[in-house]
Amino acid sequence: MNRHRPHSHRSKPASTQDQPDSVRRYRDPRFDAIAVKVFPGEHYVTSNPDEMLVTILGSCVAACIRDPLAKVGGMNHFMLPEAGGSGWDTASDSMRYGNVAMERLINDILVRGGMRQRLEIKVFGGGNVMKSTANIGHRNADFVEEYLAAESLPIAARHLRGHLPRRVHYFPITGRVMLLELARTEQEAVVRLERDYKSKIQVEPVAGSAELF
């Protein structure tokens, strides 16, 4: 008798370089779980109870979404491009990038048996770590809250804005989250990673679009 194994799915834009599986996945004995790193510009959906999703957020935001009954969930990691970049002429173009980041995550959960009305949503990040006058992090936090309100999707938990980067550990099957605010000494590496990501999305408009169903 064949048994179906829980499956997982990672999606990323073409601008994100592939990384060796050993970089993305590792056994974390502290949690007795397989840790899966979610990098900027990516989302990952799983129904594997052994997997824990991990990301580090500075100005970026992450939505952690699951259907507790279908036992499927995932995480994304994104920031909005600045309007006026070569690929983004208006603020509405910039918002479209955020819309697609959210819709792709939600749709991947729905096609795996999730139901919109059962979704449990937790959001994190949006810190003002780049010390920009544009306050990029808070703009990202505003977006994710406004998007979910417009879609009538309630937020079960949030830890947004502030001035420090965060490490998020998310267990999609149980909904458990462990969050750690990182010391300022660790901030430089986070900012460097996000600046690289920001420079890529400024010149690469998101491919395609998505609609919730």
UniProtKB/Swiss-Prot annotation:
Gene Ontology MF term list: protein-glutamine glutaminase activity
A Gene Ontology BP annotation from the UniProt entry: chemotaxis
Family matches, as CDD domains: CheD
Enzyme class: hydrolase
Sequence ranges of Basic residues compositional bias: 1-12
Family: Belongs to the CheD family.
Protein name (Swiss-Prot/TrEMBL): Probable chemoreceptor glutamine deamidase CheD
UniProt gene name: cheD
